[in-house]
Amino acid sequence: MKGKFLKVSSLFVATLTTATLVSSPAANALSSKAMDNHPQQTQSSKQQTPKIQKGGNLKPLEQREHANVILPNNDRHQITDTTNGHYAPVTYIQVEAPTGTFIASGVVVGKDTLLTNKHVVDATHGDPHALKAFPSAINQDNYPNGGFTAEQITKYSGEGDLAIVKFSPNEQNKHIGEVVKPATMSNNAETQVNQNITVTGYPGDKPVATMWESKGKITYLKGEAMQYDLSTTGGNSGSPVFNEKNEVIGIHWGGVPNEFNGAVFINENVRNFLKQNIEDIHFANDDQPNNPDNPDNPNNPDNPNNPDEPNNPDNPNNPDNPDNGDNNNSDNPDAA
């Protein structure tokens, strides 16, 4: 389905900055030395198909002096085939805030869920319906998978700038994760410094609602903090960071001009939070036989073939097992 929406003038696009969305002067002075403990920085019933706002209704965010974090490695190119492969779940976001309409990025990771930043959802001022999502957007005239309206927001319980957004079905009763295949999350067991990565999203310095990919390398990795040498601008907030297998390893939040860009790295703590809140999120190793979370793994306690599972007929503690001394089975030599 090709959605037609009202044009947005790129001259008036209000971008969610990748440097700061908070008003405190201290937050604007983020240093790369404080990456491990940085304050958060920036860069219901069925709803009717959301509409793109007119240019005249768009207003810039205040205090956006660090909106663009363009580094010497400015390898950015447009993605025009947005509906195929790992590009399809990358999503253009508009937030209709009291002070104007702002843009950001996100990535679909479940049947009705998307990941983006806390500072993106904060722009809704507590009204989830203010956030609209357009997966696989090609440009301001072409939204091949239509639009979706948010209904619930869950912020990451840790310090990382990460949020889960749940969406209502569209007018055709389709879920956002049905019109596009949700992204695969990396288990990040092999992620390390100097690996090639990409950040894909909807930067505000490019034509409205056009998808762009930046290429670079990881330069720093510790805990939930990841830094890299590629370039982003306002509007990239919430963009997925992909590894060379096109798996999501982090969610871009912003950067420090002339120094680095950064993301929330999907480490074990973040992964556990996501699994607790998104039932159908898919991690790359979930299907592996040795993965303890795989229900087909014999060592999974929920697997009926697990020898320790009480209902396993081979379990000596199973009351139906003839070797169970408490069992009156006629085949049981200990039966009364």
From Swiss-Prot:
Residues 1-29 form the signal peptide. The keyword Hydrolase applies. Its EC number is 3.4.21.19. GO terms for molecular function: serine-type endopeptidase activity. Residues 289-324 are annotated as: 11 X 3 AA repeats of P-[DN]-N. Proteolytically cleaved by aureolysin (aur). This cleavage leads to the activation of SspA. This is Glutamyl endopeptidase. It comes from Staphylococcus aureus. The gene is sspA.
